[in-house]
Structures are given as C-alpha cells and as structure tokens.
C-alpha cells in the first residue's frame, strides 16, 4: 500500500489547479480578439445603416431618421430590436430545415471573411498565406444559403430570387477572382498583409489603384454585384419578385438577411481598401510624421484603424450614392455584362500583368 505525504498531495492539487487556470486564461485570451472583432463589425454595420439612411435622405431632399438617439444614430438598433420581437413564421408546405439553415449560412460565411482582413500590421485575426482566396472561397458559400432559403420557402418568387442570386454570384465571382489573381501576381503573395506591405514601398503612387486601374474598375463593379446592390439587386427586385428569397421570412430570420447584406457590403469595401488603396498606410509623405508612431503602440493602432476605416467608408459612400443614381438592370443585361464584358476584360488584364511580371524577371 502506497502512503502519500500530505504536503505532496497539496502540491499535486495546487499544480493541477494552476494548470486548469492556465487553460481557462488561455481560452479567454483566444476569445478576446474574436469578440473585439465581432463588436467592431457590429458597430460598423450600425454606422453603415445610419449613413445610408442619411445619405439617401440628402439625395432625395428629405429629412432622415431623427428620433432614435441624437441625429437618429440609434435607428438601426431600434429596427433590430423590433425584428427580435416579431413572430417567426414558417411556410406551411416549405422545407423547415432549409428555411432555417439558409440565413445562418449567409451570415456565417460572410463573418468568416473578416478573419483575414488586416486593420494594421499586427491587427489581423489570422494572417494566412492564402488570405484573399479564403475570402473568395468562403464568400462563395453565401449564395448556397440564399438558394436553400428560396427552395425551402415553397414560393415561386422566393425560388426565382434564390436562382437569380446563384446565377449572379457565379457570373461575377470569376472576374472578381481574376482581379485578385492580378493583385497577387504584383505582390508575389496571397497574404493580405503582404499585399498591403507591397503597396507601401512607393507611397501614394504605389497603390494598386494606379498599377491596376482596369482591374480596379472590374473589381468595383463585381463587388457591387456580389453585394446585390443597385443596379444589381435582381435577386430581390420588389417590382418583379415581391422580396425575392426573403418573401416568406419574418422576425429574426429576416433580420439575419438584413445584417448579411450590410456585412457583405462592409467586407467588400474593406477588401477594396486592402487590395487597391494601400490598406492602413497613409501613403502621403508630407503628412506622415514618424514621431507620432514612436509615442506608443496604442496610438499607432488607433491611427492604422482610422486610416483603414476612412478609406473603407469612402467606398461605402460611392456604393450608397450609386444606389440612387443608376437604374436596375434586366437579368439578361446583368449576365451579358458579367460574361461578355467583365470576364474577357479581367482575363486580358491578368494576361497583361503576367506578361509584365515575366518580362521584369
């Protein structure tokens, strides 16, 4: 029979307790960046909704939201709270599982894209060597959720909206991917951090906007189509399909689609900033003061986030203004634009970029 000393038993218990606490603290430290990113994304979406309402009101010469909070800034929060308390209705002959899973797939696939977006040199959740292609691969899952929602609703308008969403995504995903390939060739990397660093070598004129102007225009149009924004909102055209794949939804599930559209718009704007506008780099030599960054890591972090978001919201303004400027395309015009114009242009741009890169070796 083995007899243990009391002191040894206490030491073993304290050691096991210490190891358990280390595991708990380790899990907490892993969750902190994720929760911070989710909180930032939520605030970003609320700001986008408020901006769209204010800009739309200004363009239409009317008064925007003004009662929910100062200047109506809490209007999006009020709308979300209202949707939370709405009843969740299910179509009588629809597929309940597909009907429920569809909105979740749309939101989760877009949320995963934020993990590879750098807000600064070290401000990124996961600096992967295939960062831009992870975004393309994950974002291409969202139309599957929309198609599931349309099919599970057992409604002709919903099903047509889901089919349109899938066709539109396939048509514009290819030019988008070819534009990203051109940027990766210029930067010699698929990492989003490396792409931003490659643009910082020559300051403002080193942005890929100037080195890839054709690719920038194609990327801009394709990203608007991927976000299903006007003039590319064919999957939910009110005059034709009531509300498209959202027709049978209510309550929180309808709110998930609402959130997914703005999440997609924000992530597309962030990738325009990262791929073409130099990311977190200010890139203006006369305004760059190195002493500011020597004052501390916190100040440097704030400056990087501010620069990234300023460029992002500039593109968001263009997207919102486009909504009230251009009319909606027909379905045949949308597909012709993607397959007959943007695809050959983006392919030619990729071949030219490859040729120049080979000649410069």
Swiss-Prot record:
Pfam families: NADHdh. The keyword Thylakoid applies. This is NAD(P)H-quinone oxidoreductase subunit 1, chloroplastic. The gene is ndhA. Keywords: Chloroplast, Membrane, NAD, NADP, Plastid, Plastoquinone, Quinone, Thylakoid, Translocase, Transmembrane, Transmembrane helix. One of its GO terms (molecular function) is oxidoreductase activity, acting on NAD(P)H, quinone or similar compound as acceptor. It is a multi-pass membrane protein. InterPro entries: NADH_UbQ_OxRdtase_su1/FPO (IPR001694), NADH_UbQ_OxRdtase_su1_CS (IPR018086). It is found in: Plastid, Chloroplast thylakoid membrane. It is an enzyme of class 7 (translocase). One of its GO terms (cellular component) is chloroplast thylakoid membrane.
């Amino acid at each position: 029979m083995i007899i243990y000393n009391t002191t040894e038993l206490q030491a073993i218990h304290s050691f096991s307790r210490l190891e358990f606490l280390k595991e708990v603290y380790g899990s907490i430290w892993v969750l902190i960046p994720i929760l911070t990113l989710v909180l930032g994304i939520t605030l970003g979406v609320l700001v986008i909704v408020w901006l769209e309402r204010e800009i739309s009101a200004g363009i239409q010469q009317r008064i925007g939201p003004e009662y929910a909070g100062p200047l109506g800034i809490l209007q999006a929060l009020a709308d979300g709270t209202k949707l939370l308390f709405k009843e969740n209705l299910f179509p009588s002959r629809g597929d309940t599982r597909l009907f429920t899973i569809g909105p979740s797939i749309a939101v989760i696939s877009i949320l995963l894209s934020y993990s590879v977006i750098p807000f600064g040199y070290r401000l990124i959740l996961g600096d992967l060597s295939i960062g831009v292609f992870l975004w393309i691969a994950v974002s291409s899952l969202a139309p599957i959720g929309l198609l599931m929602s349309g099919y599970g609703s057992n409604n002709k308008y919903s099903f047509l909206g889901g089919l349109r969403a899938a066709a539109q995504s396939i048509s514009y995903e290819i030019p988008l991917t070819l534009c990203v390939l051109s940027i990766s060739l210029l930067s010699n990397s698929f990492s989003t951090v490396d792409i931003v660093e490659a643009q910082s070598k020559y300051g403002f004129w080193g942005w890929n906007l100037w080195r890839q102007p054709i690719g920038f225009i194609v990327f801009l149009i394709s990203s608007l189509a991927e976000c299903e924004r006007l003039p590319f909102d064919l999957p939910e055209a009110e005059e034709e399909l009531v509300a498209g794949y959202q027709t049978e939804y209510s309550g929180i599930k309808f709110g998930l689609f609402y959130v997914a559209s703005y999440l997609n718009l924000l992530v597309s704007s962030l990738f325009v900033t990262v791929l073409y506008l130099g990311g977190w780099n200010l890139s203006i030599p006369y305004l760059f003061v190195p002493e500011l960054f020597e004052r501390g890591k916190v100040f440097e972090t704030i400056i990087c986030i501010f620069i990234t978001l300023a460029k992002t919201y500039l593109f968001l303004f263009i997207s919102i203004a486009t909504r009230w400027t251009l009319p909606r395309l027909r379905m045949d015009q949308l597909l012709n634009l993607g397959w007959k114009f943007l695809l050959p242009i983006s392919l030619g741009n990729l071949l030219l970029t490859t040729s120049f890169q080979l000649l410069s070796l």
